[in-house]
Design a protein with these regions (language model features):
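Conserved S-adenosyl-L-methionine
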Residues: 1-82, 99-100, 106
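Short coil/turn segments at beta-strand junctions that form active-site/ligand-binding loops
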Residues: 44, 70, 87-89, 124
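Alpha-helix C-cap/termination motif
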Residues: 66, 85, 120-121
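Conserved Class I SAM-dependent methyltransferase catalytic core
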Residues: 41-45, 49, 53-57, 101-163
């Protein structure tokens, strides 16, 4: 969405649209401005992988709702089969973890595999969301940048690797 300058939530309804203090034409006008600023002709392509078929179906549905389904290739694939491609690459992942889908030991094994697969290479960046405070130690290197965030009600860290 960011590459194509598609505004988040452009196709959804907001409860604030019923507020009397904001004229309804303001919402319409801002949506028109946002749509006029979209860059549908950009060279954006993406790939989405998961080992869970249901997760892939949800991702496909969301991509369609966002209007980017034709630019994303989805496939069932394990992280163990991940390979770096040539050129620029950004990996963004929200892996399963102890509190969400996996037990702690399995999550730690996954982080180790990610550390082996996500090599420090020019033109490659990695962003990982997890609540695990020991992630960097298990992954094998310190993040270039960290941010606190919530994934729903779960306190997490956003670990960014780009150097």
């Amino acid at each position: 969405l960011k590459s194509m300058k598609i505004a988040p939530g452009i196709n959804r309804y907001f409860a604030a649209e019923k507020w009397n203090c904001v004229p309804s034409d303001v919402w319409k006008e801002q949506r028109e401005i946002a749509k006029a600023n979209e860059k549908r002709d950009c060279d954006f392509r993406a790939e989405g992988y998961d080992i869970d078929e249901l997760a892939l179906e949800v991702a496909k549905k969301n991509a369609k709702l966002a209007g980017v389904a034709d630019r994303i290739t989805f496939a069932k694939r394990d992280i163990k089969d991940f390979e770096l491609n040539d050129g620029f690459m950004t990996v963004i992942t929200n892996p399963p973890y102890g509190e969400r889908l996996l037990d702690v030991k399995s999550a730690e094994e996954l982080y180790k595999v990610m550390g082996e697969k996500f090599k420090r290479t020019q033109g490659k960046s990695y962003t990982i969301i997890t609540p695990d405070d020991d992630f960097e130690k298990i992954f094998g290197r310190k993040a270039d940048k960290r941010r606190k965030l919530y994934n729903g009600t779960l306190k997490c860290q956003l670990y960014m690797y780009f150097k």
